[in-house]
Amino acid sequence: MSEISLIMLAAGNSTRFNTKVKKQFLRLGNDPLWLYATKNLSSFYPFKKIVVTSSNITYMKKFTKNYEFIEGGDTRAESLKKALELIDSEFVMVSDVARVLVSKNLFDRLIENLDKADCITPALKVADTTLFDNEALQREKIKLIQTPQISKTKLLKKALDQNLEFTDDSTAIAAMGGKIWFVEGEENARKLTFKEDLKKLDLPTPSFEIFTGNGFDVHEFGENRPLLLAGVQIHPTMGLKAHSDGDVLAHSLTDAILGAAGLGDIGELYPDTDMKFKNANSMELLKQAYDKVREVGFELINIDICVMAQSPKLKDFKQAMQSNIAHTLDLDEFRINVKATTTEKLGFIGRKEGMAVLSSVNLKYFDWTRL
């Protein structure tokens, strides 16, 4: 049995997919797409090593200890070159995680022809009339190249060392004078590029699990600046001490959302030792945090917030706070509730030394079936 390693490319920005969630994090059941695709291929062969390129290594490592992860580059070629640094097997199979339904039959065709050339690649024939600049092409000579592809590792490394931009491994190998062998591709191995492609593939739908997160934050009064809660000015001078603008509600809510998604906490994302966050707009930081949560496949169900303050009174500001949160997070206002309470003059809150906020949120997987 030939020694083969597997590289799965999962560091793309999903620009053409045109949704808030990166396509590699779409959920198929409970698995993100990148994991589902990798499990599928890894079930076909005892690979020496499996390497996944990533734009979020810390988060992806939470799903499995069976693979190695490496930060991707700005392009496919850069990501592949970095991943190849971890590969020492004679052959390497490379696939895009967006080709999620590669079959065992296609996989076997690649393996069976391993000794035929320097790169073995699946290809589809073109059935439709094809024009280039309004001139008909000979469709018999056209091939639609797919992945996975198997290459001789040393030759692929040498090809990528040219620092040219190749869109797949076969063109890189061919540029080095290497021999390419084509096997029959398949419709199910078409790349998931646009959101409309989801309707063409028979994929498992997202799980209906709900993920709950809580966030708690406390700040002391003492800054002669506006007191802000959810970006709403509550008082012109009763500001809270903080590295940022002191919006304790926004901080609490940010922590709750990050926690529900398993993405750490606000201190990791926006450390108070970083001067670029000095006096930062906390509602803008909240939006950025939620964008990260959406990128990895989640969306908000509802938000419930309890503000604890002896003073000032917040009754007249709750509606404005709810509206501002809804606008910032692009969420229906009926899904947001803001409550206010005192501590009956007990503790530091009762002594009017500061205030605290407890936020709770529920997330669900992004439902791509609605697209």
UniProtKB/Swiss-Prot annotation:
One of its GO terms (biological process) is terpenoid biosynthetic process. InterPro entries: IspD, IspD/F, IspD/TarI, ISPD_synthase_CS, MECDP_synthase, MECDP_synthase_CS, MECDP_synthase_sf, Nucleotide-diphossugar_trans. Pathway: Isoprenoid biosynthesis; isopentenyl diphosphate biosynthesis via DXP pathway; isopentenyl diphosphate from 1-deoxy-D-xylulose 5-phosphate: step 2/6; Isoprenoid biosynthesis; isopentenyl diphosphate biosynthesis via DXP pathway; isopentenyl diphosphate from 1-deoxy-D-xylulose 5-phosphate: step 4/6. Its cofactor is a divalent metal cation. The record marks 139, 191 as: Positions MEP for the nucleophilic attack. It comes from the Bacteria. 4-CDP-2-C-methyl-D-erythritol 2-phosphate binds at residues 217-219, 243-244, 265-267, 270-274, 341-344, 348, 351. Keywords: Isoprene biosynthesis, Lyase, Metal-binding, Multifunctional enzyme, Nucleotidyltransferase, Transferase. The keyword Metal-binding applies. The record marks 16, 23, 243, 342 as: Transition state stabilizer. Residues 1-210 are annotated as: 2-C-methyl-D-erythritol 4-phosphate cytidylyltransferase. It holds the Pfam family YgbB. GO terms for molecular function: 2-C-methyl-D-erythritol 2,4-cyclodiphosphate synthase activity; 2-C-methyl-D-erythritol 4-phosphate cytidylyltransferase activity; metal ion binding. Gene3D superfamilies: 2-C-methyl-D-erythritol 2,4-cyclodiphosphate synthase (3.30.1330.50), Spore Coat Polysaccharide Biosynthesis Protein SpsA, Chain A (3.90.550.10). Residues 211-371 are annotated as: 2-C-methyl-D-erythritol 2,4-cyclodiphosphate synthase. Its EC number is 2.7.7.60, 4.6.1.12. In the N-terminal section; belongs to the IspD/TarI cytidylyltransferase family. IspD subfamily. In the C-terminal section; belongs to the IspF family. Bifunctional enzyme that catalyzes the formation of 4-diphosphocytidyl-2-C-methyl-D-erythritol from CTP and 2-C-methyl-D-erythritol 4-phosphate (MEP) (IspD), and catalyzes the conversion of 4-diphosphocytidyl-2-C-methyl-D-erythritol 2-phosphate (CDP-ME2P) to 2-C-methyl-D-erythritol 2,4-cyclodiphosphate (ME-CPP) with a corresponding release of cytidine 5-monophosphate (CMP) (IspF). This is Bifunctional enzyme IspD/IspF.
